[in-house]
Structures are given as C-alpha cells and as structure tokens.
Amino acid sequence: MGSQPPPPGSPLSREEGEAPPLVPAEEGRRRSRRVRLRGSCRHRPSLLSRRELASNGPAVPATASSEIMASAAKEFKMDNFSPKAGTSKLQQTVPADASPDSKCPICLDRFDNVSYLDRCLHKFCFRCVQEWSKNKAECPLCKQPFDSIFHSVRAEDDFKEYVLRPSYNGSFTNPEVRRFRYRTTMTRERSASLYSPSSTVSRRTTTPPDSGVLFEGLGISTRPRDVDIPQFMRQMALRGPTTTDERSLRKIQEQDIINFRRTLYRAGVRVRSIEDGGRYRDISAEFFRRNPACLHRLVPWLKRELTVLFGAHGSLVNIVQHIIMSNVTRYDLESQAFVSDLRPFLLNRTEHFIHEFISFARSPFNMAAFDQHANYDCPPSSEEGSRSDSSVITISPDEAETQELDMNASTVRQAPWDDETPGPSYSSSEQVHVGVSSLLNSSDSSDEELVSGGTTSQIQGVQTNDDVNNDSDSSSDNCVIVGFVKPLAERTPELVELSSDSEELGPYEKVETVKTQEQEQSYSSGDSDVSRASSPRSVLGKDEQMSKSHCDSDTRISSKKEEKRSTSLPAPRDSSSTRGDRVCSPYNHRHRKGGRSRSSDSRSQSRSGHDPRNHRKHGKKRLRNKRSRSRESSSRPRARKDKKRSRTRDSSWSRRSQTLSLSSGSTSRSRSRSSDHGKRRSRSRNRDRYYLRNNYGSKYKWEYTYYSRNKDRDGYESSYRRRTLSRAHYSRQSSSPEFRIQSFSERTNARKKNHSERKYYYYERRRSRSVSSNRSRTTSAGPDRVRNEKPGGKRKYKTRHLEGTSEEAQPAREFTSKGKDSHYQKSKLDGSYKNESDSFSDSRSSDRETKHKRRRRRTRSLSVEIVYEGKATDTSKHHKKKKKKHKKKHKKHHGDNTSRSPVVITIDSDSDGESEVKAGIECSNGSLPQPIQDGAFETKDVVTIEDELGVLDKDCDVTALADDLSTSQTVENCDSPAVPVEQTLDVREESTFASDLESQSSNVSIQAEPSRPVPSPRTSLSSVSPGRDCDVS
C-alpha cells in the first residue's frame, strides 16, 4: 500500500503476509471469530488487530462501543489516516488491487471521513452512509439495521456519533413502520380484517349479522329491502351526475355502495348500459390467458359483489372468487360452462351476477368509474310509481335512451341537455316534434329567436302547412325542423354568395334566390307584414296560384324567418304576417331548405326563371348583350345576388305578389311598412357588410329600390330600382342609365363594379328606406330605421359619395327612379332593373334618397308599396315601377317578354301610412318607336320609364331611347291583388311616390300626385322599352 510500510498489526500487514504479533492463538482466533460473527459479513472491518485483541483480553466479549472506537482510532493511526476531523483521507494512493475494504462500498471511491456503523462496524464515507440512512437505516453490505454512525474518529476516545432520528428508521425490520401497498394487494392483515367476522360485519355489511342477499333469498334472513330502492335510486341519481363533474364515488362511503348494490340485487335491477364512449375490453378467455395482468382489475369488483351476495360468509367469498378467477382463463364469461360452475353457489342470482360481471369486465373503467358511468334500468317490479324518474340512474346522456322507454315526458324534458339522442326519439306527436325542433333550433342558433312570443303558434301554423309537413318529411321522418335560425355571426356566408355569380349555380342560385327573396321579403316586407302576410295572405289573395306554392314554401321558410323575426322585429305583425315572419326571415331562408321550397315556388311561379339570383348571374354575362332576355333568364343568376342582397326577398314577394294588387293599399302599405322594417333589417343584416356608414348617418340620400312585382316577371323582376337623384354617384358608377341598368345585371359580369354599386345601392336603398320609414308612419318605421342605420357604415360611405356629388336632394321620385333603378336594381334584381336607372337624382334628391332609401328599404316589400309618406302629414304616393332595365334587355332578346302588358300603379299614402292604390291599366298594342329625350318629363311628379336603355341626364333627367313601344298600358285603380305587377318604387322626398308597374317588356310612365310638390327641378325619368309604353297616372 505505497512505499511506506504499513504498521505492524494492521489489517494490510496481515494481508501482505507479515507475521502477526505474538498472541495466544486460540484466544485471538476466538475473538476474531466473534467479531466476524458480529459483522456477519465476509468483508468484516479489520479494526481490531490480534495484538489489540490480545491486549484487551477478556474484555472483548463485552466490548462496548467506546472500546471499539478506541481500537478503531488506533487502527486509523496505524493506517495513516489524517487526524483532521471530516477531512481524513488516505494519504497514499490505493492500488488497483487493493482490498474492497479500502474503498467505500457506496460511492466506490476513497473514504472521506471514514465512519462505522454501530452494529456491524462496516466502514463507509460518512456522507454516503448518512444519506443512505435517510432512505433506509440498514447496512448496505449486511442489511443489518443500525441506530447510529461513528465518524470523525481521531482517537479511541475522540470521535463523534451520529444518532439516527426515529423518522429515518423506517426499515421493514421495524414493526412499527407500515409499508405502502396498493389496496388490491392482499396481505395477512387485510385478509384477516376483511374476512374476519368482526371486521366483515363492521365494514362490509349493513348490520353485524348480515348474511348476504343470497341467504336472504333463501329465507334465512329475509328483509323486505325493496322498499328502499327508490331512495337509493334517487340518491345515486343525484350523486351519479355530480361525480362525473367533480366528485368521485370514493367519497361515498363503502357502506352506502354496498347497500346500494345489495338493493339492486334484491330488486333485480341490472346495468342497462355503460357510458363508455364506445370503448370496451376484450373479455375472452384467450385474452385473459395472454394478458393475466388484466385479471387484477376484476378482483376488487368480485370481492365487493361476492360480499354483497354472501355477506359475512368470507369463506364462500374466497371460494367463489377463486373459482371465478380460475374459470375466466378457461371459459368465456358468456359461455354456459362458466355459468354452470357458478350456479351451485349463486343459485338464482347467477344470471344477474354474470350480467353485472360481464358489464364491468367489458367496460374500460375501474370499479369506481364503472359505478359512475353505469345506467341501471329498473323493471316495473315493485310498487315504485315514481321509479319512472328515479328508477333509472341518470349518470350519463346515454341514459336518456334508457329513460325513453320508461317515460316519454321525461325524455322530452331531457332533450335540451341530451345532445346524443336524436330528436325523433323524443317526440311521439307532431307538436312534440315541433317543440323539440324549436328547442334544437334555438340551441343551434339562439333560444331567444325560436322561443320568442308567437313562435310556438307560428311553428304550429307552419306545421299545418303542407310544405312544412313535406319539409319535416324531407328533413327527418318524425322531426319537423320548423326553423333554422343561425346567429348573425354565422350568417356572413351570404357575402360569399353575393360574390359568386357563376351560371353553374343556376338552379341552386334559384333556390338561394328564392330563399333570399323570401328573406329579404321578410325584411323588405320588413315588418314581416308584407313578406309574411303577402306570402301567406296577399299572395293568396292576389295570386292564388303563386300564393299556394308560395305559401307552402313561405310557410316553411317563414317558420324559420318568422321565428327569427319574432325576436328581432318589434314591428306589429298580422297573424298571417306572423307566420310570414318566420318565412320571411332571410337567414332562415338561407339556412333552411325553405329556400328550396321557395325556389320551387319561384320555379313554378316564374317560368321564365326570373329568380333574382339567377337573373343576376345571367345578368352579368348577358345583361350587356341581352338586356331583356337577361332580365328573364339572368334573373336567376341575379336572383342569387338578389338573394344575397335581400332583393330576392322583393322579387320573390313580387312574384308571389305579382298579382298582388296595389289596391290593397293599406294592406300593402302596412306590409310595406313592415316590409320596410323587415327590409331594412334584412338589408341591415344582409348588407351591413355592404353598407358603408359614413358621416351621412344623419344625411341619407334616400333611394328607393323599387320592387316591381310583375306577374309576368314572376316577381323576380320586381327588383329594387334605386334611383339616385345624385347622378354623379351613378355617373361614377355608370354614366348612362343603360349602363346602370346593365350594371345591375352586369353586376354578375363586373363583380367588382357591381359590388361597389351594390354597396352604394344598398346604402342608398337603406337610407331611402330609413327615410321612408321616418316619413311613413309605419309601425316598423322606428325599428326599421334603426336597422337601416345599422349597416350605415357602408351606407355612410355611399352617402358621402352621393353628398360629394350633390348636396341638394332632388325630388325623391327622380332620385328613386334614377338611382335605385340603375344601381340597386342591379344589386337586387338585375333582370328587373333594366330601364329605370336612366336618370339620376340631384344632390338634394340624393340626400332625400338617403332618407327615402332607408324608408325604401323598410318599405321594401313584395308589393313594394313604399310607404313613403314624405312628411308624416303629407299623403305620400307610392309609385311602383317595374324594372324596365331588366325587361328592356330581356325585351331586346326576347320579344315575347314584351308581350306582357305593363301595369301602372299609383299609390297614394296618407300621413297615417295608409296609401290608396290606384292603378289604371291601359293596354294599347302598338309599337311606339318613340325615344324619350332627356328631360322629356321635367314634371316633379311625373316619372316616365321606358324599357329601352336610357341615358341619365346629369340634370337628373332620364333619357330613354324607345326601341319599340308596341304596347302602352296605364293602370288605374288596380285594386285586385291578382294584378301582376313588377313594382318599382319611385319615392319623393315630398312623400310623392311614383310606381311603374310594367311587364317584362312594358314601359311604365308614372305620374305621382304629391300631397305637396317636390321641390326638384326635374323628376322625370324616361325609359324606353321595346314594344310597349305604360303610362301610369
């Protein structure tokens, strides 16, 4: 061990073969043997040399720790350990072949402050053995427990003793220390405590003498405990759902669980289903053979169940458990062999036990989680009348199915929270379906809309409709989805629809157009009076054909729209309009298949396919080339856009109320009021995105988008003809009225341009609606205006542009006929927009347009009776002009369209909001190739619209080139709702409205008698339509 010779008598000297000191051999061997036994280790500490042992003599047998430490100190000196406490190191390098005693057994490095254990005297580094003792107070070498450590040994009487604290003494040898074991680990103590009669009686049974359910069944100790099952059911039903949230059944005392399980066995209540989320385990015998570890989870459950069955008979529990665990790997749990082995023990409870055992074995849960997710089905065995509710432990939504069989009412009551159960399973009748559908719809969109007042009656009314019943059949076998109203936040996709103009969507667009039309109609019928009433009533009253199909589709759609509207629209509704409200809700149409019904409606009613959306689509491509034909055919593509813009509302209403008679002035007016409100709302909803609300919140250039509802045009042509008196705005959009007219249909072609114009159109129309609503004392005027102002952002932008062009508002008529026809017709019903956008209103008229636009928007209804009452006191005349632009184009390409006779309707609206509709129908067949010059009609009250493309005079005069006026028609006092008219509303600020109603190829000249003249230099709009002239007075 280095160059320095080890001291004589040291262990190393002996190992190197040096002669030991002279001592009595026998005594030395005896003492060393004692030390060896004491160390009980092959590598005993060589602290005591033979010489030391000899010197100690007989004192060794009673060696004390002090003596040992003294000898150890001597040995340290001989081994050249440093005398410094805590830093003693071997001063010389330990050779590679040094004895294991020369290194610390724990760190396998040189000793650092050599220390000795009090019992075995094994040497370790003090720090190493100290840390070791914190974990286990056992010698790492001999595994003997120790209580103290001797360290810092300098001399026999100079050392330190480190006494272990009791906390560190946690070795297995200490009987006071209890080792951690899993609850499923069976130890003697546990087996004794679990199966001893005393412990079993105290812990596992209800009462000390409990003998188990089996023995109760045999009559040994029968206790009628079935009476308690309702109480247990209620208790567990209350605990079950809460445990899934926060609590666990562990908090429920074992006794309660045992009692509950015992009660279930007594009553024969079995687990019906497990809320396992579709997960399950393999329980085949082969699986258990391959995976014996999976058997462990079965043990706790088996012990509990067998304890429930056998009670205090612990021996039976052990025997049956052993049999079960042995057979699980032999037979399948469902096999007859497995059951037959248990029948001698379980007797009449065998099937029940096997059912419960298989349910638990299949489930992916442990015992506690299984109890939480288990659904129990109580048979009607006891006197439990209340068990229908309490018998089934509702712990999971799956139990709804369980309860379904027990009680329909309870299942229906659970419908709101049970999402997994389909609607039809809840309802047993139509009304129930309706209620459930309303609940489902309300959950999908907003409960408020469907639950709002009158919704239930509306839903029922809709059910009465055949179309609604058809929808219910189509949507689901039993459930009628009356309305599907999505939140406003989820309705933005309509913008996307507006942008999409492809003709490929023809039928789809048509459907969407119908939806949008109805939606817009509901809003353009704003108060949902027009849209709803006109769809179910006015359509029925005016066009029974259209009303039939339309009412059907409207009814379905109205159910949705009306539901939404019932909440959204404060405006008063007629009972029929109330139905229509749902129908008219544009969002409902969009989201519902009601749009399809409307599209079918539109298809049936508009043979030419004037669907505004389709017309828009075709209008884009063909409007430039085929104005008249695009009016018809492109009404489909446009219709889609119109739908997007809620123009389809008007068009659908127009086609529905094509025969709608303006004579029903008050009805139309109330409708227009309500439709104004609805329009504005729908527009505000649909066009919030389009309207730029600028600083013109106060200053709206009212523009009336005229819904010319021409029966010939199927109401699709009833497009919003927004006439902006401020021609400058339109000028920038399109210099010529023809272009504007085209732009309506071209909007499909020029999406960008159409989009901006559309925005402006929406804005102006919105403003005009708001203005008209302000002026028209319609019940919906207030909310409508609010709605109009809602999208005011874009509208403001548009208005700013309008104001920039013209601050002064020219007569509302000029503005309306010009601006709306040109720009908004394009946006609403491009096909219908053909001619009227020729003239623009002055700046003043544009300002008024803004106002009228809001009103217009509000008044936008199926029979676009602009309840524009100029001033509240003034009698405003609603002039409805058919969209000649679309007709004009369509006429160019289709002469047959011109064959339809134009209808002119003059509407007088009192300050009360009632407008008398006077329509003079004068049909003269003759071609009038008479172009109308700019400013041909400068009369404030007279607006002439011709189908030919007209050029808007910048002085707000409309020049229309008459291509061929084969027919001129003047409609006077047309009260019958059956009169097919495409209504374009020309509104004046002075509450003067001119409406031109013309067939697809008819020219309408509207002369409005204002309650007071409009202070506009020119209010004449001339448009030329091939083959027909319509003069309206």
From Swiss-Prot:
Claim: Lipid metabolism is one of the keywords in the record: no
GO process terms (BP): DNA damage response; intrinsic apoptotic signaling pathway in response to DNA damage; intrinsic apoptotic signaling pathway in response to DNA damage by p53 class mediator; maintenance of protein location in nucleus; positive regulation of DNA-templated transcription; proteasome-mediated ubiquitin-dependent protein catabolic process; protein K48-linked ubiquitination; protein localization to nucleus
Cross-link (Glycyl lysine isopeptide (Lys-Gly) (interchain with G-Cter in SUMO)): K561
Compositional bias (Low complexity): 434-444, 465-477, 522-535, 654-669, 770-780
Enzyme Commission code(s) on record: 2.3.2.27
Localisation: Nucleus; Nucleus, PML body
Protein's name in the database: E3 ubiquitin-protein ligase Topors
Region called Disordered, residue ranges: 1-36, 414-477, 496-692, 713-934, 970-1033
Basic and acidic residues biased stretches: 507-518, 540-566, 815-837
Source organism of this protein record: Mus musculus
Interaction with p53/TP53, as annotated region: 457-731
Cross-link (Glycyl lysine isopeptide (Lys-Gly) (interchain with G-Cter in SUMO2)): K74, K77, K84, K89, K160, K251, K701, K818, K834
Positions annotated as zinc finger (RING-type): 104-143
Ranges for region Interaction with SUMO1: 438-654
Bias (Polar residues): 455-464, 731-747, 992-1008
Record-linked InterPro entries: Znf_C3HC4_RING-type (IPR018957), Znf_RING (IPR001841), Znf_RING/FYVE/PHD (IPR013083), Znf_RING_CS (IPR017907)
GO CC terms, sorted: centriole; ciliary basal body; gamma-tubulin complex; nuclear speck; nucleus; photoreceptor connecting cilium; PML body; spindle pole
Organism lineage: Eukaryota, Metazoa, Chordata, Craniata, Vertebrata
CDD domains assigned: RING-HC_Topors
Expression triggers: By genotoxic agents such as cisplatin and camptothecin.
Transmembrane segments: none
SMART domains: RING
Biased composition (Pro residues): 1-10
